[in-house]
């Protein structure tokens, strides 16, 4: 057995194991954790109790409830916070009385930890020697830390959004209307609007990729004639589509808010459009859009 890894089914980790990041746990273990913790039971601590023990706030837990697999999302969010580790997770499960989880998943967790330690040792042996004081290629802080108004500058608590808004500057008035209808009403959605939320000084392509892939659950595309001429909008749209081929995850939502002289973009034709130009359905427009953005 690898030194520092607890024996199968043990309730508490050894001190050495406390330093292993949560990334050591693979998908199989995480899915089985979800099977145990997603179930809401009055006699056993579920994922919401674990989230409180991880110091998640009430509103953060409410946001997690939107997801089909809240335990998986909880682990993803927690592993970005300081102090998150395999050892700490096992300590919390033991403290909450979930010995059943520890006994059932102990062997699998031990196996994952062994593989992780072995991989780290192999990478360390293959890595060329670098002198930290003269190697300018070693980043001190995540390049994508502090890219939005409410971001943590150190990257420990990044800002998340319900939707990234892809739009042209000429369509900004409609974006303002979206903010009024979706953020400042009972829907209380959180939109990522570049001109309002993104700090200047970083590559626009890198920021867009980070926000669309990792910070926003959906992307709304405001389609217009000017949109078709925008290289930035074209990049954002194609990047979002690449994350969800065939729109299986309903990640991208096109909006047509005014008549167009040019053809609707072919890459978006297979996705259901929210059409603000249709007077027969305009009364339902914001409700449908808000519901689509609120889906887990």
UniProtKB/Swiss-Prot annotation:
Any one Gene Ontology molecular-function term assigned to this protein's record: TIR domain binding
TIR domain segment(s): 159-293
UniProt region (Intermediate domain), positions on chain: 110-155
Tissue-wise expression: Detecetd in mesenteric lymph node, prescapular lymph node, lymphocytes, lung, kidney, skin and urinary bladder.
Any one cellular-component term (Gene Ontology): cytoplasm
Keyword Phosphoprotein: yes
Biological process terms in GO annotation: defense response to Gram-positive bacterium; defense response to virus; inflammatory response; innate immune response; MyD88-dependent toll-like receptor signaling pathway; positive regulation of canonical NF-kappaB signal transduction; positive regulation of interleukin-1 beta production; positive regulation of NLRP3 inflammasome complex assembly
Phosphoserine sites (modified residues): 244
Entry comment on modification after translation: Ubiquitinated; undergoes 'Lys-63'-linked polyubiquitination. OTUD4 specifically hydrolyzes 'Lys-63'-linked polyubiquitinated MYD88. Deubiquitinated by USP3 that cleaves 'Lys-63'-linked ubiquitin chains leading to inhibition of MYD88-induced NF-kappa-B signaling.
InterPro entries the record matches: DEATH-like_dom_sf (IPR011029), Death_dom (IPR000488), MyD88_Death (IPR034249), Myelin_different_resp_MyD88 (IPR017281), TIR_dom (IPR000157), Toll_tir_struct_dom_sf (IPR035897)
Domain Death: from-to ranges: 32-109
Cellular compartment(s): Cytoplasm; Nucleus
Gene3D superfamilies recorded: Death Domain, Fas (1.10.533.10), Toll/interleukin-1 receptor homology (TIR) domain (3.40.50.10140)
Keywords assigned by UniProt, alphabetized: Cytoplasm, Immunity, Inflammatory response, Innate immunity, Nucleus, Phosphoprotein, Ubl conjugation
CDD domains xref list: Death_MyD88
Quaternary structure and partners: Homodimer. Also forms heterodimers with TIRAP. Binds to TLR2, TLR4, IRAK1, IRAK2 and IRAK4 via their respective TIR domains. Interacts with IL18R1. Interacts with BMX, IL1RL1, IKBKE and IRF7. Interacts with LRRFIP1 and LRRFIP2; this interaction positively regulates Toll-like receptor (TLR) signaling in response to agonist. Interacts with FLII. LRRFIP1 and LRRFIP2 compete with FLII for MYD88-binding. Interacts with IRF1. Upon IL1B treatment, forms a complex with PELI1, IRAK1, IRAK4 and TRAF6; this complex recruits MAP3K7/TAK1, TAB1 and TAB2 to mediate NF-kappa-B activation.
Function of the molecule: Adapter protein involved in the Toll-like receptor and IL-1 receptor signaling pathway in the innate immune response. Acts via IRAK1, IRAK2, IRF7 and TRAF6, leading to NF-kappa-B activation, cytokine secretion and the inflammatory response. Increases IL-8 transcription. Involved in IL-18-mediated signaling pathway. Activates IRF1 resulting in its rapid migration into the nucleus to mediate an efficient induction of IFN-beta, NOS2/INOS, and IL12A genes.
Domain notes: The intermediate domain (ID) is required for the phosphorylation and activation of IRAK.
Protein name: Myeloid differentiation primary response protein MyD88
Taxonomic lineage of the native organism: Eukaryota, Metazoa, Chordata, Craniata, Vertebrata
């Amino acid at each position: 057995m690898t030194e520092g890894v607890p024996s199968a089914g043990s309730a508490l980790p050894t001190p050495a194991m406390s330093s292993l990041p949560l990334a050591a746990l693979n998908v199989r273990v995480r899915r089985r954790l979800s099977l145990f913790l997603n179930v809401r039971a009055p006699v056993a601590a579920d994922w919401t109790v674990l989230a409180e023990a991880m110091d998640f706030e009430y509103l953060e837990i409410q946001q997690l409830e939107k997801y089909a697999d809240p335990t998986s999302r909880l682990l993803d969010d927690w592993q970005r916070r300081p102090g998150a580790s395999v050892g700490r997770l096992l300590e919390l499960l033991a403290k909450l009385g979930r010995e059943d989880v520890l006994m059932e998943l102990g062997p699998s967790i031990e196996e994952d930890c062994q593989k992780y330690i072995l991989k780290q040792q192999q990478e360390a042996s293959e890595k060329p020697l670098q002198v930290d004081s003269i190697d300018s290629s070693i980043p001190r802080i995540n390049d994508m830390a502090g890219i939005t108004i409410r971001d943590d500058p150190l990257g420990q608590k990044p800002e998340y959004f319900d939707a990234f808004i892809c739009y042209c500057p000429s369509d900004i008035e409609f974006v303002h209307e979206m903010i009024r209808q979706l953020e400042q009403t009972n829907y209380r959605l959180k939109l990522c609007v570049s001109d309002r939320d993104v700090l200047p000084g970083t590559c626009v392509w890198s920021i867009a990729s980070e926000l669309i892939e990792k910070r926003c659950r959906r992307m709304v595309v405001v389609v217009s004639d000017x949109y078709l001429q925008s290289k930035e909008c074209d990049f954002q749209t194609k990047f979002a589509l690449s994350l969800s081929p065939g729109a299986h995850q309903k990640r991208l939502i096109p909006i047509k808010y005014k008549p167009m002289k040019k053809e609707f973009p072919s890459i978006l034709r297979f996705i259901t459009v929210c059409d603000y130009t249709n007077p027969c359905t305009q009364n339902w427009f914001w409700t449908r859009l808000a519901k689509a953005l609120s889906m887990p």
